[in-house]
Amino acid sequence: MPKMKTHRGSAKRFKKTASGKLKRGHAYTSHLFANKTKKQKRHLRKATLVSPGDFKRIRQMLDNLK
């Protein structure tokens, strides 16, 4: 059976933390900033963790990620 391959699109979007959780960036950060409040833009800058509901599915795509 062939080797499992890491999903390259997901590998660019997620980083694994030291404890094994997955870190991701926020959506809504590419353009149209004039319509967003300062508070909203400030919160969107910070990375956040992947939710438990999505974690299992994303982990399968990133099985070989270091």
UniProtKB/Swiss-Prot annotation:
Chain segments carrying region Disordered: 1-29
Q: Name one Pfam family in it.
A: Ribosomal_L35p
Q: InterPro entries, alphabetically?
A: Ribosomal_bL35, Ribosomal_bL35-like, Ribosomal_bL35_CS, Ribosomal_bL35_sf
Is Ribosomal protein one of the keywords? yes
An example Gene Ontology biological process: translation
Matching PROSITE patterns:
RIBOSOMAL_L35
Instruction: Give GO cellular component annotations, separated by semicolons.
Output: cytosolic large ribosomal subunit
Q: Which family does it belong to?
A: Belongs to the bacterial ribosomal protein bL35 family.
Q: What is this protein called?
A: Large ribosomal subunit protein bL35
